[in-house]
């Protein structure tokens, strides 16, 4: 039986709590990036939007700028990133790795493989790319009853949208061998197929995000605010804990998953968005669990109302006691 811990208490984050770190990040970069908007009439703005949409449809994917980063500095991660860069350069404009790395480090992400969407958007803006890829690769010694001692060479690739900050593509590639070099060779031989898969997905994601409509809903009010008076948050009738996935357990992943949930006035879930991601199946586990639960609607002065809430789940593997 796998040992892990998930906080069972559902944490509701208020708007001020959510935006506190984002404000600090934006202030940090506010002096670096300045954007000027020219006045547009409604018709000219609509025409401009149509032109931009047409350009997105007709421009080839190589016009999109991407950055490939290795937050964990080890030889295999850097070697994998170099080979992935070579494969993706045929379809995308891959930015200089040293410049991208400098911009990435300037944002000082505490957990680079467990970013919030706000942190990711700031990083993407600092780098100046449409997407950035985070690469983590290692060669591990494994043991099993069937194979006894063997080596596993793996690479986890995170593709992140600079526009939305969301994790839009995640892939784990693993290969085994009785020798370290054999496992590594098999992994590197798979890079061409991985690059092809990434090249097929990112341009389509860019089109989808451009057409995405953002709905506005009231959010959980601050505790001492006027809006909090006689307000009651939505709650599940029966709480369910999301599963700590087997793949997360195997790689000893500790992560926080934040999910934004839109409820209608009856407590029905309209939309869910992962706004702090981690990969390894944890995002999907949280989404599936939240959607399984039946929710009591939010109320103010005993009247039900639609609401947007932010829920947080913490995952951590527990080490076996000696």
Where are these regions (language model features)?
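Short, low-complexity, charge-dense intrinsically disordered segments
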Residues: 1-9, 13-29, 38, 48-54
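Sec/Tat signal peptide C-region and signal peptidase I cleavage site
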Residues: 59-63
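Charge-biased low-complexity segments
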Residues: 65, 154, 168-170, 179-192, ...
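Short beta-strand->alpha-helix linker/helix-N-cap micro-motif
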Residues: 65-73, 85-114, 223
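Solvent-exposed loop/turn segments connecting transmembrane beta-strands
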Residues: 74-79, 179-183
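Extracytoplasmic/secreted envelope proteins and their assembly/folding machinery
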Residues: 77-85, 117-121, 191, 195, ...
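Short, solvent-exposed, polar/charged sequence segments at loop or secondary-structure edges
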Residues: 95-144
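Amphipathic beta-strand/beta-sheet edge segments enriched in Tyr/Trp
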Residues: 133-178
């Amino acid at each position: 039986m796998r040992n892990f811990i998930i906080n069972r208490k559902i944490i509701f984050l208020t708007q001020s709590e959510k935006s506190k770190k984002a404000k600090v990040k934006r202030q940090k970069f506010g002096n670096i990036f300045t954007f000027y908007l020219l006045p547009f009439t409604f018709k000219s703005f609509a025409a401009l939007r149509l032109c931009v949409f047409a350009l997105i449809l007709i421009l080839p994917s190589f016009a999109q700028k991407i950055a490939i980063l290795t937050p964990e500095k080890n030889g295999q991660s850097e070697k994998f990133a170099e080979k992935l860069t070579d494969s993706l350069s045929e379809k995308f404009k891959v930015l200089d790795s040293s410049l991208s790395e400098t911009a990435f480090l300037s944002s000082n992400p505490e957990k680079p493989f467990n970013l919030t969407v706000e942190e990711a958007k700031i990083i993407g803006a600092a780098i100046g790319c449409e997407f950035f890829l985070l690469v983590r690769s290692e060669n591990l010694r494994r043991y099993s009853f069937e194979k006894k001692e063997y080596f596993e060479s793996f690479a986890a690739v995170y593709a992140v949208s600079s526009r939305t900050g969301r994790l839009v593509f995640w892939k784990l590639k693993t290969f085994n061998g009785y020798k370290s070099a054999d496992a590594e060779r098999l992994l590197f031989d798979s890079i061409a197929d991985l690059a092809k898969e990434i090249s097929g997905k990112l341009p389509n994601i860019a089109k989808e995000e451009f057409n995405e409509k953002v709905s506005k809903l009231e959010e959980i009010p601050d505790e001492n605010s006027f809006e909090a008076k006689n307000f009651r948050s939505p709650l599940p009738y029966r709480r369910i804990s999301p599963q700590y996935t087997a793949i997360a357990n195997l790689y000893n992943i500790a992560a926080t998953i934040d999910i934004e949930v839109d409820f209608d006035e009856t407590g029905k879930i309209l939309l869910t968005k992962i706004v702090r991601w981690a990969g390894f199946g944890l995002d999907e586990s949280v989404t599936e669990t939240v959607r399984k639960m039946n929710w009591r609607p939010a109320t103010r002065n005993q009247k039900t109302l639609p609401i947007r809430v932010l829920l947080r789940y913490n995952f951590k593997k527990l080490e076996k006691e000696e």
